[in-house]
Amino acid sequence: MNALTLSQAVSSPEVRVVDADQPRHNDRSLVQVAVGVLIQNDGAFLLTSRPVGKVYEGYWEFPGGKLEAGETVEQALRRELQEEIGITIGNCTLWKTERIDYPHALVQLNFCKVTQWSGELEMHEGQQFAWQHLPVTVTPVLPGTVPVLQWLAQERDFQGSTHS
């Protein structure tokens, strides 16, 4: 399988600003994050809660994590999903990217669709998990997750709110 590159993704040009009233540091560098959109045969997708002690603790998101120096998105996603939720992924496709300006970090989320994996889900960081369909029933949803729910809704011709 070829390494996924950031240029393969469909990107949105704007940066979504979250909690705009909160202060930000001017010297923040862009943090690259690999995110897995795991989709079962019935169309359900996996959301996990952010662990205790992390920013936005308890918010629901797609699993993943930061790229380490020299890693591709695919390598980082494979490592993160093994470390965080105990699975080994098969093929993954870089699908979309989104830049989010949070008060604590400026991030580029690199979303990969994953339809093949092995192993049982084990939440190694104390988080919860839920297989969801649209509209999602878990709350609250992390702001960086909302665009993905909207993209899934477009692909599935889903009408209505994607989340509470």
Question: What does each model-identified segment do?
Answer:
Residues 113-115, 121-156:
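NUDIX/MutT-family hydrolases
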Residues 44-83:
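Conserved Nudix-box catalytic region and its N-terminal flanking loop in Nudix hydrolases
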Residues 14-45, 66, 97:
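Conserved N-terminal beta-strand and adjoining loop/helix that marks the start
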Residues 87-97:
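A short coil-to-beta-strand element that immediately follows conserved catalytic motifs
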Residues 2, 88, 154-158:
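HhH-family (HhH-GPD) DNA N-glycosylase catalytic core used in base-excision repair
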Residues 40, 98-121, 128:
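Active-site-adjacent beta-strand/loop module that shapes the phosphate/pyrophosphate-binding cleft
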Residues 4-23, 162:
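Intrinsically disordered, low-complexity terminal tails and inter-domain linkers enriched
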